[in-house]
Amino acid sequence: MPEYKLQAPYTPKGDQPAAIKGLVGGVNDGEKFQTLLGATGTGKTFTIANLIAQTGRPALVLAHNKTLAAQLCNELREFFPDNAVEYFISYYDYYQPEAYVPVSDTYIAKTSSINEEIDMLRHSATRSLFERDDVIVVASISCIYGLGIPSEYLKASVKFQVGQSIDLRSCLRSLVSNQYTRNDIEISRGRFRVRGDVLEIGPAYDDRLVRLELFGDEVESISYVDPTTGEILNKLDSINIYPAKHFVTPKDRLDSAIKAIKKELKDRLEFLNQEGKLLEAQRLEQRTIYDLEMLKEVGYCNGVENYARHLSGREPGSAPECLIDYFPKDWLLLIDESHVTCPQLRAMYNGDQARKKVLIDHGFRLPSAADNRPLKDIEFWNKAKQTVFISATPGDWELSQSTKNIVEQVIRPTGVLDPLVEVRPTHGQVDDLLFEIRKRASKNQRILVTTLTKRMAEDLTDYLSENKIRVRYLHSEIHSIERIEIIQDLRLGEYDVLVGVNLLREGLDLPEVSLVVILDADKEGFLRAQRSLIQTIGRAARHVEGLALLYADKMTDSMAKAISETERRREIQNIYNIEHGITPKPAGKKASNSILSFLEISRRLNQDGSTDDFVDIADKLIEHSAKDSDSGVSLESLPELIEKLESKMKIKAKDLDFEKAAILRDRIKKLRHRLVGR
């Protein structure tokens, strides 16, 4: 059993001890499904951390979006600094899937942009699953998409040991076949170089270099090396170099795949010609033959994922291998905000197949392209072992699966009660809202306002801004990483009010928010359903002066149930506080930069843009990191940032733009000074 070392400055309190005991008992008894029904702010993540530590199993924590996944990853890394807490989300900065619109005869080619840092974290996750037992992977729904074959990925890895005799030429060929490229001038992730008796590799799973020093054919030493300074960071006895891509296809399987694709093409062309679809047949033949030539010559083609079934040797309709298949047999699945995440699991497959069917019917893809897909709902649950659903408002399906194995967590360790709920008439609501905002802002408290439409949110934001209110507007078109920055600025007090539609409900840890305002609360629908109202009200549940204002002209069933549940919890919490002599106190949790914020900074530094932009970023990080590691990018992240800045500095110097290069040099010195002071 792996040993998890849970580190926290506090012990379980309130309902946490009973919840932990109940969940651990259920896991040890082999219960397939359990539900942690935990009110907002009751410390569900800490409860889950204790569950993982006490059961000692590798765990997959599933979140429904990148923002929540980043928050969970950060929290779990704080609880388990000595264990492997990994982060696995979609590595696309931008993704436009291949599609065809028959009405306008418009073909849309696939376009995408891969975030190298997130790709590195994905590789780090699978590496940890192969090499360690104490692994927690925090993932988004993207983990149910195909991810190569774990056994082939592991088999293709190259192992080096000190004292081992190797054939250097053979090793280099193995690296190339594993999709590493040789570059003796500049080395980075996915590259290697040879200098005399020294082989340096940029592994896919790390931003450090691996240096192998040889004496003849013998490996004399193995070490991790700083890619910028060349400084040896630590020595190793052995190391596995995993492929640069998760999709590994041996030569014999590639040959078999090409034969299978040719056979499928022949059968499909016969079918299309019999149906009189001559244009579709010609289109399919032309595209597929070109792809086959590319596969034969270079082992790759654009859209190669559409041939994934053949390349992996799967049967038609069979489930693809995904992240779950990299886990050992005995693992634990934890689904956060399950009332949102579980419906997502069910929807992913249907949405993917609808798009693929159009492409197949019109001759853009072979029928086997439909097997390049996410898992079906039933396939996912067949792969899953023991599951714990986590939500303040679990869905009916989760509750029905858990039956008697439902653990409730209502008491907050801080003693803070659920917010008071007031229903006020809509007449004069804007002026009333303005008064409440000013009252809260004067106390340095934050306010969330939810509307039904984007237009209403925009108009309200403009009105509040005209009345000298520091306000921002959050909408669905904002990139997930930028969304984190907006929420971060709210916590740091850059502004007081955040207006949104459906972006403020689940999983956001905002202890500074004391007032939540719900406009048009009596308009029944998805955004004003019982669960949505409870979740939105819960955004003020971390503040001692928490208040939820519902503007409505009538009391709907959803409103009545949401208010009743909030009052029930509030009464339980109040009685507990009185019996134990507890005085509610604020959570006092500092705002901290998420892992995604740093990845976004790295992405912007990698893009072509004005030097002033990334100099400003460096200045901001210097300012934040000088305060303390919680208010800015962590010190552990600074080496990679320095490397990015140094790369830009060299480019400017090469372009003879010495003035801007000197500015960057000065910023780098300040960041290095911060590192030395650790």
From Swiss-Prot:
Residue window of motif Beta-hairpin: 91-114
For this entry, list what GO says about its biological process: nucleotide-excision repair; SOS response
One Pfam family assigned to this protein is: Helicase_C
SMART domains given in the database record: DEXDc (SM00487), HELICc (SM00490)
The record, for InterPro entries, names: Helicase/UvrB_N, Helicase_ATP-bd, Helicase_C-like, P-loop_NTPase, UVR_dom, UVR_dom_sf, UvrB, UvrB_inter
GO annotations of cellular component type: cytoplasm; excinuclease repair complex
What Gene3D superfamilies would the database entry show?
P-loop containing nucleotide triphosphate hydrolases (3.40.50.300), UVR domain (4.10.860.10)
Entry binding sites for ATP: 38-45
Localization annotation: Cytoplasm
Cited NCBIfam families: PRK05298.1 (NF003673), uvrb (TIGR00631)
Q: What does the UniProt entry state concerning the protein's domains?
A: The beta-hairpin motif is involved in DNA binding.
- Know the name of this protein? UvrABC system protein B
Its lineage reads:
Bacteria, Bacillati, Cyanobacteriota, Cyanophyceae, Synechococcales
Gene name per UniProt = uvrB
